[in-house]
Swiss-Prot record:
Subunit structure comment from the entry: May interact with the exon junction complex (EJC) composed at least of CASC3, EIF4A3, MAGOH and RBM8A.
Protein name, as recorded: Coiled-coil domain-containing protein R3HCC1L
Signal sequence region: none
Region annotation (EJC-binding motif) ranges: 7-27
Modified residues annotated as Phosphoserine in this record: 688
Keyword match Phosphoprotein: yes
Region (Disordered): 32-61, 527-567, 772-792
Tissue-specific expression: Expressed in placenta.
Disulfide bonds: none
InterPro entries (alphabetical): Nucleotide-bd_a/b_plait_sf (IPR012677), R3HC1/R3HCL (IPR039884)
Coiled coil start-end: 751-783
Amino acid sequence: MQQESERCRVRARRPDMALYVPKARRGAVLLKTGDEEESCGSPNSVVKEKQKESSLSQKEVFKDKPEARRLNINPDRKEHNCREEKKSSTKLRMDTCLQKTNRVCSKRGTTESKEVLSQGQQQGAPNAGVITNAPLQRHFKPKKVECLEVETTDVTGHERILLSQACLEISEAQVPSKPFQNVEFCDFSRHEPDGEAFEDKDLEGRIETDTKVLEILYEFPRVFSSVMKPENMIVPIKLSSDSEIVQQSMQTSDGILNPSSGGITTTSVPGSPDGVFDQTCVDFEVESVGGIANSTGFILDQKDTDSIPATMGHISLSESTNDTVSPVMIRECEKNDSTADELHVKHEPPDTAVLAHETHRDSGFKNVGDITNKACMMDTTGMSCSDHVTVDSPYVVAVRIADETSINTRSFSKFVGMSADATPLHVARSGNDTEDFSNPSACSDIYGESISSHFTESTGKLIESLSDCASSLPIKKIAGSNYNTFLDSELSMLNGTKVLSDSAVGIDLGSTGDTTEALHELRTAEEFKTEEQDDSGSIEFGVSFPDRESSSMETSIEPKATETSHTEGITAIEESWESMFNDDGDCLDPRLLQEGILMHIKPENHCSKLSGNTKSRESIQEPRSDYYNHEVPDIDLSDCEFPHVIEIYDFPQEFHTEDLLRVFCSYQKKGFDIKWVDDTHALGVFSSPITARDALGIKHTMVKIRPLSQATRAAKAKARAYAEFLQPAKERPETSAALARRLVISALGVRSKQSKTEREAELKKLQEARERKRLEAKQREDIWEGRDQSTV
């Protein structure tokens, strides 16, 4: 009976197995959620709260379960029990959903922590002695995860680092040795992409480290390596940046400067578009650097060349005529005075001695007069001394004295040049001297065999710093020289004015003073020539430069002549159009008026002589028509029978209606029509007599026009016969589709099939067209009246 009663007793309905959690596994679920929270690197407060709520709900369910059993014993409360069970099942479902969401959140947190910690492990430098013994979480999910504490250089403190792809082999080897009692298998498909992501992260970390190294290298682009050899070899230099400029300097340990022979060496820079060129054009050797610093100049002597050129060019930096010797350039740079001296020497023909003397004076000298420059040409006896040149053939002397003081930045430059065949010489000036010194202090032409010299001295503020400077150039006549040779050289110099002017202008094209200097040199050369011709004995020219303080007029004839010629040149330059002409354009200079009259008279006399007529005729052609008093005759069309009709005649027979319409195309909009009379006559019908009168005023090359009162009889008869067809032409109104449809419907009496919406759209378009037309008319009126259109 007891068994039957147990069978008949209503049992409590068990919850669904999918939502049921056995007692043995209830604690495991709680432990699992706790472990998953610990495995997450950065704990989340929201996840903790959800887990607490889930655990509390589970406890409440377990507490309510015995009460539900007690209630189920009573059969009268069956419905109530069903409701209770439904509520409990819904609670269990909610709890399981919360647990699943907690698992997903914890898994996401673990994957994020894995990615962060793997990146930190790759960027940092972990200790090599750390060996992992925990199973890999990619394949297995243990309940208790052992986290390793690894100290890195980049991270301060201890961090929990989960294993990544780098320890895959070690972990797989150690997994089978552990028991599988408390291990649950996870979904492999869910974790395999994580492993791939770890591999990608590893690659990205390596690339980032490589780029960091490159960035560190690029932060110092100016670091480059160069090799200086004791043999002064030029070594190519590699740069790590494209924008750097290679600067090479040659140093020696022995203090001896031995430049290599002339040539151009190219240093190739990788990555840069252009090469860097170092040019060395030195063909001599200097024994010691200390000697260079202490010496005041260099003397270069060249001999044994092969051929003599016919003419000698300007003294400048250029190659020789026979291309046997390269140009020479010497540059000195001193740090104390920050001065630079340049010496340019042109190689001359054989048996030519070139003296290039360059003195350097700095602020240490109080009196510049202590350094004097003298160049004396004595008899050709072979004797030589300091600052003197004695040769027995045409020679060139080029002396340049540059003075750049630290107090006064201006410079005092001299240039003495002597060349065969009356070679014009340049006037040397320094780069700091920007003023136009057009007044030469001295200009001398020296008697010698094919020798001419010019000596110029800049004035102005330079004299203040060089007040005590006095230089003289005494030159004695050679006893056994040829006088005719000198005359030839003087004549060639006088005739070669173009060469002299070109050489003077070539120094500085921007200043007009150089041109005047060339003229002054030419005039002084003429004066020296006359003096030389008058005196046949031994002549000595002395050019002296007085001090600024001395007021005595101890100057020679040559400076006076140059001053007078200089003033004449200034007056010639100062003549301008304003001084010669007034505001009305009349000439104020009577001399120019006389020249103009003579210039006009001479061509007339010449023409009269050629034609044989001594009388000058007046050939003025009178105009045939008076263009100033031209008036359009007023045409009266009131007497005409048809004032709006005109006759068109005298046009080619090949003309058609289109051709006549093209002639009167401007009247077609207002209304114009053509009625033919014969092949050369037609009637033009206009919209009004005013338009017809306007058309009569036009001129056309192919057609002629006249009113109908002056027309031929045939034209008048045609007009009377077709009087009803010659009504004034009316302008065609602007039509639209809506207007045409309305006209057709009204004429035929047919009902329109157009809907109301289409009719409203057409009316709207018509209104927009009217508004647009009104605005255009208003804008046209505003333009004519000159009103502002911004308000429109």
